[in-house]
């Protein structure tokens, strides 16, 4: 905990103090640590805190120990992601695990995570949004939310236990920075994976794939020959609809099992999911997978009133969750729900997101041409994006300090929709006189975030939980698209003067409460903390206060 070393997780400081010197609960220890880090509480702070340690206005500090379940996907650079439980394989319960991993912060910029904490088993809760996005963590895990603070839409950290239905959580949706084209073999395996998950099967003795799009079918067969090779059979037959169905049949699956597609062997439709190797692949590889997947079981259609829908259907709940999450990694917002027939659907239901899907991902065959035609046939202003910043319009109209003519323009126009800001942002800002209001509006509408409405916070059982230590100013990282947070601390140089030469027989030591270690009776304290920072207390009915001295 020395000031010349990196910050340590607050929970670790509390745990060591409680284990060695104070076996009476952790709350009082953490409260003391927080107070010693607050410059408004102590004239000379003794703890150098990193993260949320409260505010002079009595905003509470973040919790010392808050963590996520092991299945939470941590965003990495170049479109890669990893389960937080896989960051340090074999990590023991209640352990700190050093390492170096680049993760993305709340803005989508790369920062270093140098430690994984396995925090043991704790009661967890699942936060789910109206679109179906979800994250699971301990009750005191903080995520970034959009809060109406005295009429001002403000980004604030909220604990899961504080989040209620109709609150708004922040999802990071900046498209990934890509490092170049995909490795050809990885891309071919991703193409085969998407095709076989959607339109194929693989048992212990046989595998197959079929599709009516001849060009798409030929691409899958070519990928199979390049990655797997060996004897396979192709055929055609006319089905009831009159379409020609192209079929690939594989009788010997031993070579196929030897590839990364072997995870599909014997998998039931309801059990399908995205394998971990694909999550850890860069965006270019994931794009090939999604193109093949949507070309198989995906669809696009023009709907009444100049609207459009892109959808994917599956029998697997987990696959639907995975597809929605992977779309979010490309910045595409979708909605997930269970259809009446028992299938799970992932749908994109507005023009802006359909256009983003078409440019960032797209279908892998003839369906892409159909999507392009539908989008091209829509009137210029049809199907505007419904994504908005809750409370922004009312805030601007109330605090813009503009002339009457500009106020009237702001009142008549829809100024909380992100599509409006993308198109007319400069004009909206020109009609806002207050520079602070302009700054807040610009920050909330730059497109990095999606503000998702919470529908439920439910118990998810006792599970192993994990956290990361991130070396950045706000110590934030992305999990399932949600923005997560942490706190850490270390001693200040001034506090070291209270401990200086403590190991050179300057003070007496006695056994601690259980006799395992020694503890000092007093501190050497070259820095007179009692006088400099003051103190207060009450005993035998009398209050005593020592004011701080310079």
UniProtKB/Swiss-Prot annotation:
It catalyses: ATP-dependent breakage, passage and rejoining of double-stranded DNA. Signal peptide: none annotated. Heterotetramer, composed of two GyrA and two GyrB chains. In the heterotetramer, GyrA contains the active site tyrosine that forms a transient covalent intermediate with DNA, while GyrB binds cofactors and catalyzes ATP hydrolysis. It is found in: Cytoplasm. Its EC number is 5.6.2.2. Residues 192-332 form the DOD-type homing endonuclease domain. PANTHER family: DNA GYRASE SUBUNIT A, CHLOROPLASTIC_MITOCHONDRIAL (PTHR43493:SF5), DNA GYRASE/TOPOISOMERASE SUBUNIT A (PTHR43493). Keywords: ATP-binding, Autocatalytic cleavage, Cytoplasm, DNA-binding, Isomerase, Nucleotide-binding, Protein splicing, Topoisomerase. One of its GO terms (cellular component) is DNA topoisomerase type II (double strand cut, ATP-hydrolyzing) complex. Few gyrases are as efficient as E.coli at forming negative supercoils. Not all organisms have 2 type II topoisomerases; in organisms with a single type II topoisomerase this enzyme also has to decatenate newly replicated chromosomes. NCBIfam families: intein_Cterm (TIGR01443), intein_Nterm (TIGR01445). A type II topoisomerase that negatively supercoils closed circular double-stranded (ds) DNA in an ATP-dependent manner to modulate DNA topology and maintain chromosomes in an underwound state. Negative supercoiling favors strand separation, and DNA replication, transcription, recombination and repair, all of which involve strand separation. Also able to catalyze the interconversion of other topological isomers of dsDNA rings, including catenanes and knotted rings. Type II topoisomerases break and join 2 DNA strands simultaneously in an ATP-dependent manner. It comes from Mycobacterium gordonae. One of its GO terms (molecular function) is DNA negative supercoiling activity. Its main location: cytoplasm. The keyword Calcium does not apply. It holds the Pfam family DNA_topoisoIV. SMART domains: HintC (SM00305), HintN (SM00306), TOP4c (SM00434). Belongs to the type II topoisomerase GyrA/ParC subunit family. This is DNA gyrase subunit A. InterPro entries: Hint_dom_C (IPR003586), Hint_dom_N (IPR003587), Hint_dom_sf (IPR036844), Homing_endonucl (IPR027434), INTEIN (IPR006142), Intein_C (IPR030934), Intein_endonuc_central (IPR004042), Intein_N (IPR006141). GO terms for biological process: DNA topological change; intein-mediated protein splicing.
């Amino acid at each position: 905990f020395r000031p010349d070393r990196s910050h340590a997780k607050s929970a670790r400081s509390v745990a060591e103090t409680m284990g060695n010197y104070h076996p009476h609960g952790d709350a009082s220890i953490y409260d003391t640590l927080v107070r010693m880090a607050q410059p408004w509480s102590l004239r000379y702070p003794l703890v150098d805190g990193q993260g949320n340690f409260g505010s002079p206005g009595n905003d509470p500090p973040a919790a010392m120990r808050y963590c996520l379940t092991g299945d939470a996907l941590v965003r990495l650079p170049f479109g890669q992601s990893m389960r937080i439980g896989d960051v340090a394989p074999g990590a023991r319960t209640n352990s700190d695990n050093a390492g170096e991993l680049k993760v993305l912060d709340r803005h989508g910029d790369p920062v270093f995570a140098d430690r994984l904490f396995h925090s043991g088993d704790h009661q967890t809760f699942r936060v789910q949004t109206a679109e179906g996005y979800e994250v699971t963590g301990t009750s005191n895990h903080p995520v970034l939310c959009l809060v109406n603070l005295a009429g001002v839409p403000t980004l604030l950290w909220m604990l899961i236990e504080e989040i209620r239905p109709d609150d708004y959580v922040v999802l990071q949706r900046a498209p990934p920075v890509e490092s170049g084209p995909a490795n050809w073999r990885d891309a071919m395996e991703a193409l085969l994976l998407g095709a076989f998950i959607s339109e194929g099967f693989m048992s212990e003795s046989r595998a197959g794939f079929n599709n009516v799009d001849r060009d798409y079918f030929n691409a899958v067969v070519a990928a199979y020959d390049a990655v797997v090779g060996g004897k396979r059979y192709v055929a055609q037959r006319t089905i009831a609809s009159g379409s020609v169905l192209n079929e690939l049949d594989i009788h010997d699956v031993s070579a196929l099992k030897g590839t990364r597609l072997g995870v599909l062997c014997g998998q039931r439709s309801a059990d399908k999911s995205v394998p971990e190797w694909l999550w850890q692949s860069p965006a270019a590889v994931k794009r090939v997978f999604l193109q093949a997947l949507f070309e198989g079981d995906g669809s696009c259609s023009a709907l009444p009133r100049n609207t459009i829908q892109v959808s994917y259907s599956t029998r697997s709940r987990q696959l639907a969750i995975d597809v929605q999450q992977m779309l979010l990694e490309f910045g595409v917002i979708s909605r997930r729900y269970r259809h009446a027939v028992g299938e799970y659907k992932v749908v994109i239901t507005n023009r802006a997101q359909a256009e983003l899907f078409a440019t960032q991902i797209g279908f892998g065959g003839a369906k892409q041409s159909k999507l392009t035609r539908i989008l091209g046939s829509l009137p210029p202003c049809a199907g505007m994006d419904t994504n908005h910043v809750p409370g922004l319009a009312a805030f601007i109209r109330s605090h813009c300090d503009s002339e009457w003519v500009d106020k009237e323009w702001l009142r008549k126009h829809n100024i909380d929709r992100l599509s409006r800001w993308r198109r007319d942002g400069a004009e909206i800002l020109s009609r806002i006189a207050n520079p602070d209001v302009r700054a807040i509006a610009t920050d909330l509408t730059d497109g990095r975030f999606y503000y998702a409405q919470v529908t439920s916070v439910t118990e998810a059982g006792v599970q192993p939980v994990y956290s990361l230590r991130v070396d950045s100013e706000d110590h934030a990282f992305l999990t399932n698209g949600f923005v997560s947070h942490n706190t850490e601390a270390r001693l200040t140089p001034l506090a070291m003067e209270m401990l200086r030469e403590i190991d050179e027989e300057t003070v007496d030591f006695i056994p601690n409460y259980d006799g395992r270690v020694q503890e000092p009776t007093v501190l050497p304290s070259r820095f007179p903390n009692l006088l400099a920072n003051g103190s207060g207390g009450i005993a035998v009915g009398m209050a005593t206060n020592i004011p701080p001295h310079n």
